Structures are given as structure tokens and as C-alpha cells.
From Swiss-Prot:
Its main location: membrane. The keyword Transmembrane applies. GO terms for cellular component: plasma membrane. This is Uncharacterized protein MPN_376. It is found in: Cell membrane. To M.pneumoniae MPN_375 (in the N-terminal section), M.pneumoniae MPN_374 (in the central section) and M.pneumoniae MPN_373 (in the C-terminal section). The keyword Transmembrane helix applies. Keywords: Cell membrane, Membrane, Transmembrane, Transmembrane helix. The lineage of its organism: Bacteria, Bacillati, Mycoplasmatota, Mycoplasmoidales, Mycoplasmoidaceae. It comes from Mycoplasma pneumoniae (strain ATCC 29342 / M129 / Subtype 1). The chain crosses the membrane at residues 8-28, 1098-1118. It is a multi-pass membrane protein.
Amino acid sequence: MKRLQYRFLLFGFALGSFGWFVASSAFTSVVKSNNETLSSDGGVHMRYLKGKGDVLSILKSKSPAITQRFDLKWNNGKKTEVYLNNVNNYISESLYAQEALKQIERTAQLSIQNGELPDVKVYTNSGASFGLVGWHTDNGRTWAFRHENKYDKNVHFSWNQTYYKYSNRERTASNPYYWKWVAWFDLGYANQRIGLVENDEYHIDKRVPEPTPRKWDKNKPLWGDIRSKILYSAERLDPDKGIFIWFNQTGFNTKGTKGWANSGFFTDFWDTNNNPNAFTTNITSEGGNSNWHSPDWGSHTTDTRFFLKLEPYSKLFYKENGQERSITVSDYIRKAKSTKTNYQWVNKNQIKTLVRKTRSIDLGLGSAVRQTYTTKSDIASNQQLKYKLKDSTFSIDTYNNFKLDKLLVPKTNEDATAIKNGVFVKQPTLSFDFNPVLTNAIVNIHNLFAQTLDLKEHLKSDQPYNESDKAAINKVIEQIKNKEVDYIQVADFIGKLKNWSQNPGSIESKGENTAQWYADAKREFGLNLNDDVNTWTQLSSLIASYFSKDIFANVKLNGAKERRMKVWDGAKFEFIPIENTEKQSEQLANENRAEIAVSAIGFQDEGGLRDASFINKVALTPKSSKTKIANGDASKIEKAANEISYKYHYRQNFKQASWDKQNSQTKSIVVQSTDLNDERERFQKDINNYLKVQGISETEIKVNAVHKVDAMLNARKSDDPKLASVQSTANKYGLNLRSNPYTGQFYVVVDVTNANDLGNQRRANNAKSYFYYIEGLDKGAQSSYLVRFENKQKLYSLESLAVDSRGLYVKNVSKDAIIQAKQNQNLYLDTHNWNAALKANLTNAELTLPTASADNSAKLSTPNAENDEGFLSENVSGSILGYVERMTGKKLFLKERVSFNKEDKNNLKLRLTSNFTLDKKGNLEVKDPSVINQIVEEAKGYNVLVSEEKGDDPESDKNIFKITLTTNPEQSTVIKLPYWIVTKKSKTNKDGTVREQKNLVFDFSNLNNFEYNTVVSLLFTDSSFIKNAYAPLQTEFRKQLKTVLEHKYQAPIKTGQLPLLTKVQLANNQKQIDNFTFDLHKNIFNKEDINKINWPLIAITFTGSAALLSTIIASGVVLHRWRKSRKHFWEQMLKARKVK
């Protein structure tokens, strides 16, 4: 079976063949062996088929009942027993519900790792099957289920008109499946379908934006009217979750093998999984796309709806000014949220959002002021200043006698008197909040205005509302105008209105039935709204204008000097901490007491509102329908005499422990209490041991429970509030919650029951780099923390192997493990058995390398986890080679990199195959003299390629040659060899040309042993001791050096010498050599010099093309001699110079 890949969910509403997960009567079936039906009931047969991926098959009778639920469970993680438990419910709770899929996922990890998907084949006993279902999991994997005809094994789509035809209806009492399918996606989203986003012209297929002809053409997929409506209003969409859209395949025909399945609808794209921005899908069968067809059952005219889930990174396409553009779903949702002009629903907890986002009116005395004058207040007897704003439909008057508890009320975020077992279990902070009466009034005013618009839209729509429904809608609109309902009642009415299976009825009211929110606001503020709902939003705007300014208060904390503090920043309230965090008197410190006093709350001093306090009355004059808001006279306001005072003994068992006693750079707490079986006790002991050592905690903390974050993530319970808080904390600090085997780090949620004993920073968000407070999980004195732990054993790559005089080791990556667990900085591997193996056979040695260090704190990972054998990198090969040379005192020259294979789970078998060895005196050692002849023959196939590469430091006088040496068809050694140029002397010839003698100094110091033994032995060493095997390779190397240098200096080289290392120098790792001397000729114009020039090299010079030269060097092309006469050559060269 070919792999089925999705980037979205696709469901077809062809409901004719649901036989594969429904039954006509209750049953329970247990399958215990392959290819055997053990029990059946109600026409349903269960069979467990053994095959690729293992196949669960459910055979069903022709009964159309859709009333059963099957829960799929796997026993002990093995696919040997499958239990299907029958529970009555709708199809949305069927066998393939999310929890069942999660169970399947846990049993198929191996299949996923191998890039496969488990096959689930579903048959009906008529030989037909429904279609294809996909499910997108949280971690990006996709489960795909294909359904085949059990006879010919080709994928079919068969429809039965009786059960799936919709005509032009969506949902009726007799046809509930439409909404149930939506509920299967996301019941919350489905119930919130309240409107469309602003632009419905977006489409998902930029190539075929219009419906194509209904004649099958594999090159023109039938997308139908893709530019269809988004299901939900912008306010309810989440940019991180994506969206669902629907579209129609209306009125097309299915005849023979030319059905919609064969139209290319499902076979448009192929998702390679390499492009996260692609919005693609493909469905294939074993027989190829041509096998997608419907049985020849005649014409099927339908109005079928398909739903697609677009992921956040999916692209939508649209046209702007005639140009086709694209936008991701996430950005589309954000744009819709920011540009949508209609109402936003709010609740009591979102009043601050309302205040922040609602348009505000400038209350300053700048250009907004039309006139100022003095008048008599109809509410107060004193004189006041009145501001009349430009283009406003109401005026604002200011009055005296402000009362603090009118529009704002002080509050603490916790009950400071709550004591349990002698401990204050909640730590208070002082803040302010909106008066609940004000909040409730604004929420109702805002939402009822919006709901009125919604209801009016319903009256205008073409929905088949009967006269009774229309009368009910009009009645509710009238009730809103008369302030007889609240927005919750209306929301319930609208919900029923949109749910066609329910009768919306009406909101009953008898006589004078003023809604509670309005009665409270009228009593508290004198609010008197007229009947015109359209003017209600003015009050929201007016409140927003007041709270768009900063608000300050005089605050005295712990007896310190009173200071002005901001309590509202124009968007949110600022908390005033009532904790022992400020400088305080010695007496207060000894008594563990905090005192706070707040007074004179008012706006920031500015303009005519200087020192003005808050609004205390809101009134509407019946004659003018203008809102008036009263507060103190801007010129005569007196600060309030009363103040808010608090005194707290805020921690009865306070030990004055503090995180600040030790400024540690610790990143994690190393797990050491491996002697304890109980996980909770183990982590509790490790935390306490560490905190005491660091001097952070004087009292042993008590751990109530621990939760490993890896396990929480694997469970993926979307309704887990603890996991949601943990992920929020991780996002805040940029933490990767998944465990890391290379650093050993992992995260644990620790519930500390006596969190007060952590000191006055119990809720410090990030007290240490390994300790994070998790907000929202406090229970009494218990707080939860995200703690980073570290295992003592780490996983190390073989690339990290290094060598010193003691042996092979990896460098410890953890300072915490070195300090806390007393680990060594270098973690050595056990190689005590290598001496014997090397003495037995040095030129073809087999060595055992343990995969764990001697103290078991380091575990080596193979280069390719999927293969048990292969070659180590040149770097690792060089490290192992260097260690072997230390042990033997001889230099090995390997034919290829060190190879490895897995001997067992604890050891690697290494093989070092060398051509020959040298001792420190340069003595050659080979077991068989014929090896020398073999080396000479093999060397004939070696090749070298040289080019120049710029170094990282442009100011450095060092240059870099990139040398590629190929000694094996499957392996090439590439090194970057630093060099610098020394000018020894220069000479001016009689003809005016200049001759400079230069030396190249090569630096071998950064080469590892493998690179040095390979490259230096072949290119820079006198190989006469092995019959000059590498002389031709060295000649080619010199030629390419000259070629590169001539290009560098844009001048020919007349002579060049390459003195070679001796075999003794090679055996002793000569690190530097001044080994290439050349004469550089500049400004050559006479034929005599040309006669002396090396012809292959001058052929590059006369072309005058650096680009051509670079191409020739890079591709390793061998230049041929210029075979024409010298006279002709000279003419061509002069001609070329004139062209320049």
C-alpha cells in the first residue's frame, strides 16, 4: 500500500456505507487469534487479519442503523487482542474517535519510525466500502485509513442514495449527520458557528480558483466552488489552531468509472513532507490513480458537502489589484481579527479588553475643545467647568464629591485571612478592579447592541424562518430596547435560532420586568438609557476614554516615605505587592509584618483634568439623550481624606529563606537518589539536598506529587489544566520541555506543599535558572514548580571523542554533574584490551570499543542509528588513529577511514586496515613485500583537485588551499590547508619585467591524524621508499598549485620547486614546511619570455577569463597543450590583450 499523506482533514458527506463501524444491535466481540472470527452478533463479524501493518476488518450486515459506539483497546501494547465494547451513541463517538486513535498510535511507534502508517481495511459484505477518513494528531503525525473492495483490492467509492442524498437541506430532524460530523471535528467550534469572516473570496487552489467543467480530466482537478464560506466569526478563531471550511460538489454526475473520485479531486497534489507551507494531499492505491472509480450504478446527483481543516501554516490564495497573492491561515485569522468592524463579544472577565480596544474620545483640552463655559449643575449646587467636544453627541460635566467605591473598588488578589495549620496559605497583593455593577452594565450594553444587529441580520436573511420565528425575533429586539433582558438570555435565544432542530420560542416577560443589570446600574450610577440601542455604544466609548489615561495613587509601604505609584497604565491594573520585598524598619522585619496605605487615587496631572478623581455618577438627561458623567471640579478638587490601609503578618512560619543567598550558575539539579524506589521521595530528596548545599532553604520542603513532563506530553490530554499551565510557563521562558539525552536534562512538575518555606520569593517567576513557578496551580500553601533535572548519564556522539596521554575520552558537557555528582571533566573509555589486539595484527587490527565510559556517565551513539555498520568520520578516525599510534609508537597509513559494526548493545567493533607503518626512525614495516607493488598499482587511480578558498579573517596574511584527495571510489578526503607566502627576493630584468621569488609555507598543525597520514604522506613526502608510488600524483599536485597561483597573481610562473618531507619527518608529524618555491613574472611583453613559459599554464593566462579559469579548476579539467605554432600563439595572445 502506498503511503497516504494529509495536511488537513477531509470528510465526504456520502453517508451510504457506514457499515464498517456501525451495527444494528448490541454486541461485544473478542478477537484472540489471526484469521479467525471468534464471535458475532447482529449481523456483525469481527476478524483480525494478519498482513502488512496488521488489518482489523469489520463485516456488517445491510442494516442502516447508526446507533453503536465501539471503543478499540489494545491489550498490553500488543496487537493480539482487540476488545470492542458496545455503547449506544451517535456516529460522532464511533470506533475512530480520538481516544481510540491515541491507543492505536501508542502501539504503532515502530511503524511510524520506519516512515509507515498502519493499514486499516474496512469491508462491507456487499464488497463496497465508504471512503477514506483521516485524523490529524497533535504532534503532526497523520493517521490515514483506506478502504478497499475486498474482491479486486482496488479502492472504490460506492454510494447508496437512500442514506446520503441531501437535496438542498443541511440538517433536519431526520437527517442529523451533518452536525454530528462537524461535532466530531470540534464540538466547541461547531456550536459557535455565528457568522462569516470579512472576505470570502479566498481559495485554497491557486491554479484552479473557479469550478472546472464536470468532465473528468486528470490535469484539471474538480475542486468545485472552493471559494466558500469560513464557518466561524473571526473573534472565535484561534491563529494557532487553524480553521474548517466547507464547499459543495453540487449536481455532478457519477457514471461508470468517470465519477468524482476519478476527477482528480483527491489526487491533485503530493505532499513530500519537505515543504511546511504546502497545502497538499494525495490518495493513491496499489493500482494507481486510474483505479479510482465508482461502480456503474447510474447517475448520482447530489448536494454533498466536504469539510477541510486548514492547518495554521496552510496557504490561502486571493487576488489583490489583479495580482495573485497568498496568506497563511494564521495571518489570515489575525488580519480578520484586526480589521473586522462589527461587534466583539465580551464577558465579565474581559471588560479590560473592551476598555482597551473600544474607540476612545479625547478628553484633553487640545483641538477637541470647541468652547468652555460656566453653568449651573442640575445635580450639584456648586459651579463646575463644562467641556463640549467636537463632533460629539453628548457633553461631559465634572463635579465634586467623588466616592472611591463607585467605578473602581480596591481588592486583594487573595484572602489574606486564610490560615491553615498556622500558615497564611495565600499571599495578598493589592490592586483595583472595576465595580461589578459597572462591569455588568458595560458587558450588557456592548453585547446587547451587538445581538440586536445579529437579530436584524437574521430577519434580512433568506433562511426559511416562519412567521412565528420572525415574531419571536422582533419581540426580543423590543425587549432589548426596553432593558428587560440580559445578553445571556439573548445568546441562548440566538443559539436555538441557529440550531434548526430546536424551537427558539421566546424570552418571557410579564409587565414591568427590568433586567437586573439595568436596575443595579440605575440605582448605583443613576444610569438612564433611552430606547435607541444605537446610542448605547457611546457609554462604552466614554468609559474607554477615561480609562485610556494613566491612573496614579499615593502609596506608603512598610512605613517608608509616601510615593506616587501607577495603579492603571491605560490597559491594565498594576499590582501593589503587600510583601516583605521593600526596605522596612527593623521592627517590621522582626515582626514579619507588612503595612500598606493607599490614598489620593486620580489621573496623571495634565491639562484641565489635573488631580481630577474618578467618575461617581452617570446620568442621561431625557431631553437631550446625552450622557453626562460627573466627578470633581477640575479646578477645586480635594484629595480624599480616607485611605485604604492593610497590615499583614504574611507568613507565620517564615524562615527568611531566600533564593538570593547563593548566586549559583546551576542549570539543573542532578539526579542522585537512585537508591529510592519511590519517585516522589527520590525527587524530594534530590531537591532538598541541593537546596541545603546551596544554602537556599533552611527547612526541608515537602513534595506532595511529581509529574514527569515527558509523560504529560505523551498523554496529550488537551483538557489537562496542569499541562496547559506548564506549556504557558515554557513558552514564557522559551523552554523545550522534551527531555534531551545529550544534555541529560528533563523537566518535572513538583507540587510543594509547604511552599511558604521557600521564603519571601515563593512566587518568584524564575527564582533560579532551574526553578520556575507555575501560575494558576496554587492550592493553599501548596505551589507547583517546573524544575529542570539532569540524569548523570548523557548520550555523546562519536564525533566528541578526543585523545590524551591517558586514553580515549569525551569531554563532560555538564558543569552541574561535575560539581554536584563529582564527575570527572574527561570521561574515559575502557581500552585495556587494545594492546593485545594491536600486537597480534597491527595492519589489520580489530578493536572493541565500549559504548559507555568506565563510570557509566557517558553513552556513545553510533553515527547512524539505523545502520549497525559503516565508516566513522575522518575526525573520529583521526582520534582513534592517534590513540593507536600513541600506544604502539608507530605511524599507521590507513587505506580508508575506520569502519565499525555493532558487536552488541554495549560494544562497537572497530577495524583499522593500513597499507604500511613507519616507526619513529622511518623504518618501513609490511608483512608481505607484495604489498608494495599493490600500493604502486592502486596509486595510479588516485587523483587530486586544488582550489583556493578565502579564510574567515580577511585581515589575516594566511590563505587557504582546499585540497580534495580521492584514493577510494567511495571516499574522498577534503582538507582546508592554511598557507602563507614569503617573498625572498625580487629582480628587475633588462626589459623592465620584474621577477619575484616567493615561498609557500604550509601549516599542517590543524590536521587530525587521519588527514595528516593521508594527505601529507601522498602529496608532501618523498615516496621513493615505496617505489615512488605517489610521484605522478605529486607532479599533478604541483601543476595545480601553479595554476591556482597564476590565477591569483594574474601572471605566469616560470619555475617551481617542491622539496618533499623525508619518511622520518613524516613519522614524527612534521607540522610545517616551507616547501614550494616559485618565480613570479609580471608585465611580460617579449617573445623570449614566452618561449620559456610552461605551455599548459600559459594557455590559461592568454584566455584572460578568470571565470573560465575558476570553472576549469573547480571541475578538474586537464588542460591540453596549445598545439599551434608559437607565431600563431603570439598573435592570438596580443589579439586577446587588445580586446581587453
